């Protein structure tokens, strides 16, 4: 995988930094694992904008990813690695011995021809999935379930991982990248190793149009609006907003905590690190 800084042949190329992976499949994705993906433009069923800064972008198909990894005892072979426009991680097309194909999140170091397996009898190696009760303490894992059988929810993006730091009775304690320590049932499955494509964080799009290709619309500052549109709007000339930063609906922003307490808080052993 190479990180390439483009030559400044035009203003739009001057700041572009690309991550090129020559191992990725250059053809079309496997048609049997594609689903329709329609764009909402950030609107709900009444046509009102409920999520700002969304709209346009290239048409995409959703890739059906196997987050459960529940095909136990059947060895599989990695056919190829592919780009997935729906996530930062790359995905791997795997062929099971019984002829079924599935997409999974590509682990770090995974390549075409590798053998993987799921279940309690699987070998302790990167790419294999098994319950947390069978994973040695201290191991680095990704694609971790929060409820047994629900499918992976933790550590699915490029370069992500969590560490199994303890196992006591019915729960395993995980250390997340954020610094949070959390208990998860030992029957939840996880995949050994880190998620691949860690160089994704080095990428620079270089121009506004590259954001538009991805369906992201501009973000307008509140101080540049009129008073009818934002609490920071209006004033003669340039202003600082005149108050502590708030959202368009008057809720404090920049550090204001909005998370409500949940019954699952009891599983959080230590809160994430403060930035």
Swiss-Prot record:
The keyword rRNA-binding applies. Signal peptide: none annotated. It comes from the Bacteria. One of its GO terms (biological process) is cytoplasmic translation. GO terms for molecular function: rRNA binding; structural constituent of ribosome; transferase activity. Keywords: Ribonucleoprotein, Ribosomal protein, RNA-binding, rRNA-binding. Part of the 50S ribosomal subunit. Forms a bridge to the 30S subunit in the 70S ribosome. PANTHER family: LARGE RIBOSOMAL SUBUNIT PROTEIN UL2M (PTHR13691:SF5), RIBOSOMAL PROTEIN L2 (PTHR13691). HAMAP family: Ribosomal_uL2_B. This is Large ribosomal subunit protein uL2. It comes from Shewanella piezotolerans (strain WP3 / JCM 13877).
């Amino acid at each position: 995988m190479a990180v390439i800084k483009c030559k400044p042949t035009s203003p739009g190329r001057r700041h572009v930094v690309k991550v090129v992976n020559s191992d990725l499949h250059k053809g079309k994705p496997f048609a049997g694992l594609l689903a329709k993906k329609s764009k909402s433009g950030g609107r709900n069923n009444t046509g009102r904008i409920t999520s700002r800064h969304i709209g346009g972008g290239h048409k995409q198909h959703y890739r059906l990813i196997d987050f459960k990894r529940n095909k136990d005892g059947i060895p599989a072979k990695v056919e190829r690695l592919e780009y997935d426009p729906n996530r930062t991680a790359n995905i791997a097309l795997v062929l099971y011995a019984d002829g079924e194909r599935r997409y999974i999140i590509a682990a770090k170091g995974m390549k075409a021809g590798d053998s993987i397996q799921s279940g309690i009898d699987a070998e302790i190696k990167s790419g294999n999935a098994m319950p947390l009760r069978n994973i040695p303490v201290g191991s680095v894992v990704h694609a971790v379930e929060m409820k047994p059988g629900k499918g992976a929810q933790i550590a699915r993006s490029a370069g992500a991982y969590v560490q199994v730091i303890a196992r006591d009775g019915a729960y395993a304690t995980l250390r997340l990248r954020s610094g949070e320590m959390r208990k998860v049932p030992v029957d939840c499955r996880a995949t050994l190793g880190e998620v691949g494509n860690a160089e994704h964080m080095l990428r620079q799009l270089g121009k506004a149009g590259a954001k538009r290709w991805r369906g992201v619309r501009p973000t307008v500052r509140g101080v540049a609006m009129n008073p009818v549109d934002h609490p920071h709007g209006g004033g003669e000339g340039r202003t600082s907003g005149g108050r502590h930063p708030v959202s368009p609906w008057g809720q404090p922003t920049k550090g204001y905590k909005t998370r409500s307490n949940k019954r699952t808080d009891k599983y959080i052993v230590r809160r994430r690190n403060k930035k």
